[in-house]
């Protein structure tokens, strides 16, 4: 089982869209990745509304033909998905060994269960093995979920997360180009180019993290001279880290998204820049793992 990237929980911290609801952007050049965000996908395999709680995406999933169950969509999670212990118990999911998971700071041994079918609308994954653990121990009741859809669930098509319209779409017949305007290529999922002021860095796109940004302390010192305030301990999947709070003047630019005067978390322990869900609420996020490309559109 591949390691799991952090699902951050900082403790101290719709209706269906009709096919004609988004007007096509006739001014966009043919190789502009954001042209796909400006018009409805042609005959998508999937188009479903989602809810947002504390920045995170929640939608309804069928497990072994039962449900629906509330799942989160987490691009920071490797593999097909995760099962909360409540789901594993309710469905009597069979144990299938153990795995090691990492949150970027520390590792832990976890149990694995087997699921016969995991279905989001017409998109179905069969005979999958997923990590199971208590994912809700530190969640508020309104943020509780029964499982997670990881990036592997969407690895054979184009995933479109339209935050303003709260709509998730998926297509195997359309794809992001490998180069062109607004194309963000990545080598390691999903580390994309980010510009902070005059600095060009890589940031991990993580829809499961209920923050705007997390910066390693060394990176923060190169992009801002602003003061830091204590923010207590921030909880990762396997561990906790001391965090501080600051405002980065920026601008912070990711694709078409441009943010200024952004509150961020800073930690000397965290290994890389993290782009969390709260930074993406005004964006349309497109991810195509077949072409290893991402687009962040407005």
What are these regions (language model features)?
Residues 1-10:
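Bacterial N-terminal signal peptides that target proteins for export
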Residues 9-19:
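Bacterial N-terminal signal peptides
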Residues 22-298:
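Pepsin/retropepsin-fold aspartyl endopeptidases
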């Amino acid at each position: 089982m591949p390691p799991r990237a952090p699902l951050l929980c900082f403790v101290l911290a719709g209706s269906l869209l009709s096919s004609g609801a988004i007007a096509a952007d006739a001014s966009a050049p043919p190789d502009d990745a954001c042209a796909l965000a400006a018009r409805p996908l042609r005959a998508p395999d999937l188009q479903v509304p989602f809810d947002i709680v504390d920045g995170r995406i929640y939608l309804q999933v069928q497990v072994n033909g039962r449900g629906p169950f509330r799942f989160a969509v987490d691009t920071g999670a490797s593999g097909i998905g995760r099962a909360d212990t409540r789901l594993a118990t309710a469905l009597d999911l069979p144990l299938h060994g153990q795995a090691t998971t990492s949150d970027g700071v520390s590792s832990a041994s976890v149990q694995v269960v087997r699921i016969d079918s995991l279905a989001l609308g017409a998109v179905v994954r069969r005979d999958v093995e997923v990590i199971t653990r208590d994912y809700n121990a530190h969640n508020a009741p309104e943020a509780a979920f029964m499982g997670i859809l990881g990036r592997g669930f969407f690895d054979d098509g184009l995933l479109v997360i339209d935050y303003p319209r709260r709509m998730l779409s998926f297509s195997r017949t359309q794809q992001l180009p490998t180069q062109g305007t607004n194309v963000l290529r990545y080598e390691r999922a999903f580390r994309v180019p980010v510009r902070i002021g005059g600095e060009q860095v890589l940031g991990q796109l993580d829809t499961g993290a209920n923050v705007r940004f997390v910066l390693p302390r060394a990176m923060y010192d190169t992009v801002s001279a602003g003061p830091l305030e204590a923010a207590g301990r921030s909880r990762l999947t396997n561990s906790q880290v001391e965090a501080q709070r600051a405002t980065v003047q920026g601008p912070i630019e990711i694709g078409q998204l441009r943010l200024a005067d952004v509150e961020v978390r800073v930690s000397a322990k965290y290994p890389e820049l993290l782009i969390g869900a709260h930074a993406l609420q005004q964006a349309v996020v497109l991810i195509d793992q077949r072409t290893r490309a991402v687009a962040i559109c407005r």
